[in-house]
Amino acid sequence: MIKIGISASFFHEDPKRAIFKGMTLQYIEQNVAHWLMQRDVLSFMIPSPDGRTRREDSRITLDAYAQELDGLVLMGGSDVCPETYGEKAIRPEWNGDRVRDEYEIGLLNAFVARRKPVLGVCRGAQVINVAMGGTLWQDLGTQVPGALTHRNWEIYEKNTHATTIVPGSSLAKLYPGASLVKTNSIHHQAVKDLGRNLVAEAWSEPDRVVEAIRWTGPSYVLGVQWHPEFQPAGDRSFIDDRPILDDFLHHASLHKNAAYAL
């Protein structure tokens, strides 16, 4: 079976929290795992960002996960810290999670070094861009005139907009004949300046916010701003989530089969 690692979200130590007081919690949102599991994929959350433990240092590094797993999904979640891309937070609540940034960039680099596929979802797409030297809009609503409502807490994953797939792009090859699609939208940050060797493969309409990016380097790295794992099953009004999943897993299987052939 294909083995895919999923980056963790963090609840950092909080003395005010009633349960697990003073503890750091790491978790994944189950829809991500279920999305992968529909293709009989073994999913693993990747813990311990730097190998250190409360008991003693471990020799397990991020590269060890990249060696053993066949691909990586960078999950959505908290904001990317503006300091990670050389800025200061415009508002305190947009400080993001610098610890998670460094952990996920380390994971991305480890999997890219082994030429194993990486798929970034929402925040994950933003992490890919920042890791490659790009920048983000800290808040679309205040920084981009005429921006759509890209996040609505009241309706969450039911918030949608039209998205244009760039003609001739790798993404367009997965959706032949589909130039304008409907995607969900649950973010207030977004790609501003593209990172090194990244190309935009989809835009929101009509505000032209980057919705998908792909690395043109030697391994598979794709980031989508929407959440394919939240797509309503069987609802054909939305972009079909399966071509992206199958393309990612195809590249993971190529590396797995090559390893078995050695």
Question: What is each stretch, according to the model?
Answer:
Residues M1-L119, V130, W137, T142-Y175, ...:
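N-terminal beta1-alpha1 cap of cysteine-dependent amidohydrolase-like domains
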Residues C122:
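Conserved G/P- and acidic residue-centered "switch" motifs that form tight phosphate/ATP-binding loops
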Residues L222-Q225:
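Active-site-proximal beta-strand elements of phosphoester/diester hydrolases
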